């Protein structure tokens, strides 16, 4: 992205992505099955550029969050970027669905033939057509991916990464975080591994009410979306 990005830097990156997305959406009313290969390739290149920039900033926010899941600043940034990327994805969704469901087979084959490095990607997209919903429905799912299951996973991370484990090593009780306990799980001494696992599982057992509720709601979310 850039070295030590500030909020101002991130705002500029987001503004650039939003500007390019808005520009791309202007082609919606002019999409036709008989579009020339040259114009089609230009559209693919444009949307690839937007996706690349969105992925970079999304990756940065995820890494910041992974570095310290207890950081309110990192959590806020991740949620902000996730919401922004979801909104941009929804604005570009029309092109994805147009390619999957609205263009006839003859023109699709014609465009795939001249698509070069995008050919296999385009073929794969066509295979997904029968599993795609309407644009309003797909937009709802994209939004729920940020505010629904994804938000629950972040909550789970915050809870479990804050766990403090008490384990007895060589007759001495020690307090450890998850990363420190993991080193004992891989110990070459069976008794130490056993003590580490017991400490790990006991902590999850103590919190089974809240973590179990999170699991159930995530699975229910998948079921509601027709995944499970």
Task: Outline where the language-model segments fall.
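A well-structured
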Residues: 1-228
């Amino acid at each position: 992205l850039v070295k030590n990005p500030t909020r101002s830097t991130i705002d500029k990156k987001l503004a650039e992505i939003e500007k390019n997305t808005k520009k791309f959406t202007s082609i919606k009313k002019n999409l036709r099955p008989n579009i020339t290969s040259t114009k089609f390739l230009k559209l693919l290149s444009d949307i690839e550029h937007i996706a690349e920039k969105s992925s970079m900033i999304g990756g940065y926010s995820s890494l910041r969050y992974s570095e310290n899941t207890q950081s309110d600043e990192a959590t806020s940034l991740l949620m902000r970027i996730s919401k922004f990327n979801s909104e941009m994805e929804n604005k570009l969704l029309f092109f994805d669905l147009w390619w999957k469901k609205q263009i006839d087979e003859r023109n699709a084959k014609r465009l795939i033939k001249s698509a070069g490095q995008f050919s296999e990607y385009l073929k794969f997209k066509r295979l997904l057509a029968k599993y795609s919903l309407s644009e309003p429905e797909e937009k709802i799912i994209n939004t729920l991916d940020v505010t629904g299951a994804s938000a629950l996973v972040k909550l789970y991370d915050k809870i479990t990464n804050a766990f403090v484990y008490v384990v007895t090593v060589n007759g001495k009780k020690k307090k450890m975080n998850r990363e420190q306990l993991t080193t004992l799980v891989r110990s070459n001494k069976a008794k130490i591994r056993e003590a580490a696992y017991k400490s790990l599982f006991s902590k999850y057992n103590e919190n089974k009410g809240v973590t179990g509720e999170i699991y159930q709601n995530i699975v229910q979310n998948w079921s509601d979306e027709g995944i499970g």
